[in-house]
Amino acid sequence: MKRFFFLVLIFQNAFSQEIPLNVQKIIKAYPDQIIGYKDNKIIFSDKTTLIYDDFKNKTDQELLDSPDIEDQFKFVYNKADKNLIPKDDPGRIRNEAFFKKIYGNSKSEVESKMTEIIWCPKLVNQKIKVTTVNGIDKIIKKLSAELDNNPEFKKYIIDIGGTFNWRKISGTNRLSMHSFGMTIDINIKNSNYWQWDCNCKNEDATLSYRNQIPLKLVSIFEKYGFIWGGNWKHYDTMHFEFRPELLL
């Protein structure tokens, strides 16, 4: 029996060593859609695959416009910290094909997986549409219930800026994460966005970081698998996006 468990341990260690750490995080974060990894390819539950690493050196703009899946982990996401002045954009690099495989390849396919829930029933009582993929609707209900116990956050979470909206990111040809129903923009009146503050769309513009969102509020979102756009050099402090793989 001891020999059996020893062999199992060896197999598990070999498996872990064969699969890159960040791929292991992806598999753990999206178990219903991703079933494995082989020959530098992510294997999805429908047996289709996507290249994990294209081994190309990319400029900052190329990382945004044509990243592979591995590039999504280029910058480490650090949880909310009062001393944080972001110098990178962790989570802002996204492989569009990957998220289409997870949530839907078109507006109609994404919409077929949507449901309506009540956002913060006690403090806000606002109807919003979110995806049911990976139980995100249930996760947001739990997030919502916790926020409801913090009335000091009401002004930030009322009249939220949006959830589902199949569209391109302003000034780009890249699909917004709002297209997948797994992103929440909270109240824009108490938020900052780099394009508004610099009155530009130039990624190379010199920016002065601004934020009004309490970090305790951010920490609650992070607890439920959401990263914060205020953690980016190109800050978007209203923006919360379900990316549990970056928090593992």
PLM region spans:
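Sec-dependent N-terminal signal peptides
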Residues: 4-12
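A cross-kingdom marker for long, charged
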Residues: 223-248
